[in-house]
Amino acid sequence: MKLHYSPSPAETKRLEPEQLRSAFLISDLFQPGQLITHYTDLDRMIAGGVTPTSAPLPLPNSKQATGTDFFLERREIGIINIGAPGAVRVGGKSYPLGSLDCLYVGKGERDVVFEAGSAGQAQYFFISTPAHMTYPTAHAARAQGTQPIGDPAKCNRRRINRYIHANGIKSCQLVMGFTEFEPGSVWNTMPPHTHSRRTEIYLYFDLGTDMVVHLMGEPQATRHLIVRDREAILSPAWSIHAGVGTGAYRFIWAMGGDNQTFEDMDQVAIADLK
């Protein structure tokens, strides 16, 4: 498990491009036959990528990072399958996950195992946050008929699919879902916002050979990162998080912090960006 210690806003302004990437970009999450995890001191979130092949991959214990006897002893986890159909076993029960399905597993589950499907490559992205009480394991299929938001004239027409949230799958603090775009739209979260009470992690995927220019940093001192397919971004509470793609893409978003109110954000006017 790789550990990430987040720079302050003042330090972030002075970082060279490679230092910025090292601090806020995760680029190695998906490797065949491996389960890869990254731990950030931002709200103590863990991001993981799982690519099972012939052998199932169990959720590992990392006592150095969590200080517990097993991974979910004091944590919860949200999982989204971004590949072909597969399954996740929780305590011996199998949960089939189709493409873009979500599974939530609550605090206290000792055995979580990721499995490949019979056709194609299943790939799982997960986020884990600390938890103080137990909520039941819950599965959600990919949402159908989600109403789009945004304006085609501003290239930001998109559908927000919410899975783990106050009015959906219940959790202690984790909020999770994914966003996809209408044809011709490529801007996400513009005008941007911050939310000083929560950390957010993005995973950009289904880019193909295209890229996303991800904007981050304080609103009056913005920076950018070039992001490729299946790369993740760590977004501190003080940072904006927005982006524009050179083609179609999707992104998973996950948050942890003081509340689960989706609308709790501090809007930033485009005119105020620098």
From Swiss-Prot:
Question: Do the record's keywords include Ribonucleoprotein?
Answer: no
Q: Where on the tree of life does the source sit, at the highest rank?
A: Bacteria
Pathway given in the UniProt record: Glycan metabolism; pectin degradation; 2-dehydro-3-deoxy-D-gluconate from pectin: step 4/5
Its BP terms in the Gene Ontology are: D-galacturonate catabolic process; D-glucuronate catabolic process; pectin catabolic process
Q: Which co-factors does it depend on? A: Zn(2+)
Q: Which residues form a coiled coil?
A: none
User: What residues bind Zn(2+), as annotated?
Assistant: H193, H195, E200, H241
GO terms assigned for molecular function: 4-deoxy-L-threo-5-hexosulose-uronate ketol-isomerase activity; zinc ion binding
Provide the E.C. number(s) assigned to this enzyme.
5.3.1.17
Q: Can you quote the record's cofactor note?
A: Binds 1 zinc ion per subunit.
Indicate yes or no for the key word Iron.
no
Q: Which UniProt keywords apply?
A: Isomerase, Metal-binding, Zinc
Question: Cross-referenced Gene3D superfamilies, in alphabetical order?
Answer: Jelly Rolls (2.60.120.10), pectin degrading enzyme 5-keto 4- deoxyuronate isomerase, domain 1 (2.60.120.520)
**One Pfam family, short name:** KduI
Give the reaction(s) catalysed.
Answer: 5-dehydro-4-deoxy-D-glucuronate = 3-deoxy-D-glycero-2,5-hexodiulosonate
List, alphabetically, the InterPro entries matched: KduI, KduI/IolB_isomerase, KduI_N, RmlC-like_jellyroll, RmlC_Cupin_sf
Which PANTHER family does the UniProt entry name for this protein? 4-DEOXY-L-THREO-5-HEXOSULOSE-URONATE KETOL-ISOMERASE
Q: What does this protein do?
A: Catalyzes the isomerization of 5-dehydro-4-deoxy-D-glucuronate to 3-deoxy-D-glycero-2,5-hexodiulosonate.
Entry's family note:
Belongs to the KduI family.
NCBIfam families, alphabetically? PRK00924.1
UniProt protein name: 4-deoxy-L-threo-5-hexosulose-uronate ketol-isomerase
